[in-house]
Amino acid sequence: GMTHQKLFDNLVYFLKAIMPACDEAGVNMAIHPDDPPWDMFGLPRIICKEEDYDNLFAAVPNMHNGITFCTGSLGAGRFNDLPKMAKKYANRIYFAHLRQLKYDGEINFYENGHQTDCGNVDVYGIVKALVEGGFDGYVRPDHGRNVWGEDAKPGYGLFDRAMGACYLSGLFEAVEKDMNRK
């Protein structure tokens, strides 16, 4: 069967093989963390926590090897310190999916409004860490609830994602202005 090490070795083999083309074309790869961040159905998960990123960047140090920083996937693992990770890897985060989770049991959670006070993910702390770390990538609100009677694909409600985009835009503006005052 597939082991953690075999899967990691295959990922490293793939990334090393494509890095010359990424260098030539100026393309950044941005691996999305495993969702959820624990093994499921006998399948190993290898990009779940800070140590996994450290191992990946040690194996493939090329700066075109980067991250999609998904606060939903990483936040499902209560063991992850998301603001710390955001700041540590800010120069390797090329795409950020920011969303809020509310824990409902040991491994159960549900997605909620993007504001920090709506759940257990410190969205403000993450945005602050990204800005302080020099983040220069793309951001989008990840998943939205269906609100106000909206009939949309689950997780992709337009209204909630639009509110999330406005909230995140405001957070980035506030953090950047606060940093410029210091």
Put a short name on every predicted segment:
Residues 12-24, 28, 38-182:
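Histidine-acidic metal/acid-base catalytic patches
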Residues 1-12:
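Active-site-proximal, glycine-rich beta->alpha crossover segments in alpha/beta enzymes
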Residues 35:
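Helix-loop segments that flank and shape redox-cofactor active sites
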